[in-house]
């Protein structure tokens, strides 16, 4: 596939894991079926790390996390054709993402998905890495497989520490 890089919305994704090695996922308000890891756009002039920490606070409602790693390259995905007109006014055909692995060092009470006036998620839970892809929306499954492949060994090492 030839990628039109200007047609992809730049954003960050966050794989937030707890001390048991489980990953935070949320169920979006616009879906009853799919769960996803936090992600969001990068503001003008914002560094990737800043965007990731801001998105963590906005979507998960916590700052009780430490960045462990960042994936090597942009990961691209395309939206289904029927979804493009309804997302970002049809400006993008998909997203390009840089992913951050973050270790959560807080407790359950330190997560507040209603932190903003317009929350992203209606529910959340900790999920085993092995079951992340199964609950993801179909057009993001390959992204999740790539992120898991890149970060899974670092999660195991970080649990031990």
Curated annotation (Swiss-Prot):
Similarity annotation: Belongs to the Nudix hydrolase family. RppH subfamily.
PANTHER family reported in the protein's UniProt record: NUDIX HYDROLASE 26, CHLOROPLASTIC, UDP/ADP-SUGAR PYROPHOSPHATASE
Pfam families assigned to the protein according to its UniProt record, in alphabetical order: NUDIX
HAMAP family per record: Nudix_RppH
GO biological process: nucleoside phosphate metabolic process; ribose phosphate metabolic process
Alphabetical list of InterPro entries matching this protein: Nudix_hydrolase (IPR020476), NUDIX_hydrolase-like_dom_sf (IPR015797), NUDIX_hydrolase_CS (IPR020084), NUDIX_hydrolase_dom (IPR000086), RppH (IPR022927)
Cofactor: a divalent metal cation
UniProt name for this protein: RNA pyrophosphohydrolase
EC number: 3.6.1.-
């Amino acid at each position: 596939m030839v990628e039109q890089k200007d047609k992809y919305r730049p954003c960050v994704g966050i794989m937030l894991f707890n001390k048991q090695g489980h990953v935070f996922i949320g169920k979006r308000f616009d879906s009853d079926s799919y769960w996803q890891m936090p992600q969001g756009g990068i503001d003008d002039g914002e560094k990737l790390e800043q965007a990731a920490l801001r998105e963590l606070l906005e979507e998960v409602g916590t700052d009780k996390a430490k960045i462990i790693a960042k994936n090597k390259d942009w990961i691209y995905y395309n939206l289904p054709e029927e979804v493009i007109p309804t997302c970002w006014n049809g400006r993008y055909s998909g997203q390009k993402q840089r992913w951050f692995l973050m270790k959560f060092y807080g407790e359950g009470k330190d997560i507040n998905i209603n932190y903003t006036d317009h929350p992203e998620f209606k529910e959340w839970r900790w999920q085993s890495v092995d079951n992340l892809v199964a609950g993801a929306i179909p057009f993001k499954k390959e992204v999740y497989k790539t992120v898991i492949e890149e970060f899974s060994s670092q999660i195991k090492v970080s649990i031990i520490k």
